[in-house]
Amino acid sequence: MNLDDKLRGISLSDEKINELKTKPNLIKNMEVIVNTGNNFTKMQYSLACIAPKNCNLIELSNLIEEGYVTNDSLLKGLVKLGKKSKDEYIDFCKKHTYNEQDIINFIRLLKEKKETKATISSKLKEQYLYYDTKIFLKEMENYNLNVPMEKYTKNWLDEGEIKFLHKPGENPQKTKKIMEDHLKRTGGKVITRFPPEPNGNLHIGHAKALNLSFEYAKKFNGITYLRFDDTNPKNESNELYNGIIEDVKWLGFEPYAITASSDHFEAMHEMAKTLIKKNKSYVCFCSLEEIRARRSKYQKERDEGNDDPLILSPYRNTSVEQNLIEFEKMLKGEYKDGEAVLRFKMPLKSKNPLMLDLVGARIINMVHDRKQKNYIVYPSYEFALCVCDSLEDITHSFCSREFYTRQEPYHWLLQELDMYEPVQWEFSRLNISNTVLSKRKLTKIVDEGLNWDDPRFYTIKGMRRRGFPASAINKFVQSVGITFSETIIDVKILESFVLKELMQIAKKATCIINPLKVYINKCTTGIISNEPVDVNNIIYIDKDDFDETNNSDFLRLTKIQPVGLINLGVLKYIKDESDGIRCELLTVDECKPNKFIQWLPNLDNKVELRMYKPLFKSFDPDEIGYMNDIDLTNSLEIIDGYVDNTVLNTHIEDKFQFIRIGFFCCDFDSIINDNQKKLVFNLTLPLNKNY
């Protein structure tokens, strides 16, 4: 049986198979697995999708075949484990294979305690690290707490480790004078910052960081800087600067000041010279590839007893005088990009790989977009972050947890410069289901044809365009709380916050998607949206509201069952017509209907509806490779709709509840002027037809 047949055997379509053939690494992985002779199951396919280079595919495939790997989460854990012996793999599987009933009982216990979905998911991950997520999804189906959402956001900064953070003045410094000077400058205020790179768009994960930085400072009457980490002019633009400022303000945050790392570039050049004079920095002429190779070699040699620092760089012992000369040459542009870098001469006792002589500055011979100046020598992220935190007297430097290993070089550098040291505090990234948030991954999807503000993305601009209120986004990220452990939050929890906000602010209007012409025998004057409407002998209802089969479970119009028309009367079927149906219009006193449906007096107001579904099919798209899980075709359907007159006076971003269809937001693709009007609405959240 060839590979195509194997893939069809796990229910992949021919279209999907042809798409996979464009991914040579994936095909190679699948061929390796097929050649083992093992059954090619969906889990074997998942292994092929997520396996990195040098992964022990054959061993892991055998473990799946032998029944040691029972779910995709455990498989992902094995892959992260790296190359191990079979016995080590088996021990890992046994350690993280759990009794399904124990997991179910654990979930049900938390449900009895009225815990939120997010809390249950987080606690489940802590207790059963590599549990089968399908168990969670099944147990949490239709689990909705009837608890005010304010309960989840009220005390979010008073829970967990964050309530034990230091007060200004309590964080230790190299000297007492450094702290005294800091307190004189700040008056003991809490000072935080939000430091995005202007090389992409903010997403919902950034909303969590924004809320933490701004709300923590606000709680203590402090201030927050919006500081751009603009150390790489190759990837930055004024458009991205302005877009980030717009997003921050749209979410409701007003920074004390907008600053940038580039405000301090000249100061950092002088600091670099200070470090050279202290013999704590040197100019290195190794390429970046050679630097990486030498670091790897040094770690290996050190483990074997040879800790010669010159393995890291043959230029490490260059004299101070010569380093000053070489650095001046860098500043004057006498070296090309990549020919020379400034490296920190760090203590090598630490096992932290980020203490292996980090690059402090490099040559990028181009004009900085924001400053409109060519600095030639640009500081690295590691250099700029700690220096700018110190210069802005940041008291609480919040970072996502992957920055944990950066703490050591952060404090080493500030101590060598005799500068004030802020405290770094790490929190977990926000991960939500059915999407990806990584800038690298989103960029790859953008390359497939989507825009950064596509409503299927959970970028701030994408969510705004889709119609998510800023208040709902903020309340959601606050409800998740601040933790160190990572978990995936069900996107339905976010949607529940969005729904609650929209119920309060969205204007109700009538919309019909599949119009059915209805001839009525008796005309009257009705009321629609509180405005009198002349009803002629023709109206329109939605085809989905009429069932010709007289199904007893159908609660709207049938040939034997009347239905109410909102603010008009009761419709009773008489007979079919060539282009519709004929009905009698009765009063509610004459006939009590089971249900009321929307209707229109005409089809004069045609609009475009963009019906969005999740961009990814799986709860965790990364489990099978996010590009294999993406659904570009079925995640957007564009259809026509017909609306009542109240919708005509809409503005961009106005939010509507189209009765019994869903919540919609007026898109900026709409044309609204005196000469032309074309309205486009994005589906924010659908409603059940019987809502």
Swiss-Prot record:
Protein name: Probable glutamine--tRNA ligase
One BP annotation, GO: glutaminyl-tRNA aminoacylation
MF (Gene Ontology): ATP binding; glutamine-tRNA ligase activity; sequence-specific mRNA binding
Sorted UniProt keywords: Aminoacyl-tRNA synthetase, ATP-binding, Ligase, Nucleotide-binding, Protein biosynthesis
Pfam families in the cross-refs: tRNA-synt_1c, tRNA-synt_1c_C2
Organism annotation: Enterocytozoon bieneusi (strain H348)
Motif position, 'KMSKS' region: 436-440
SUPFAM superfamilies hit by this protein: Nucleotidylyl transferase, Ribosomal protein L25-like
Motif 'HIGH' region mapped to chain: 196-206
Transmembrane segments: none
Keyword set includes Ligase: yes
Record-listed E.C. numbers: 6.1.1.18
Gene3D superfamilies, sorted: HUPs, Ribosomal Protein L25, Chain P
Family, similarity comment: Belongs to the class-I aminoacyl-tRNA synthetase family.
Residue numbers binding L-glutamine: 229, 381
The reaction(s) this protein catalyses: tRNA(Gln) + L-glutamine + ATP = L-glutaminyl-tRNA(Gln) + AMP + diphosphate
Record: residues binding ATP: 197-199, 203-209, 429-430, 437-439
GO cellular component, one term: cytosol
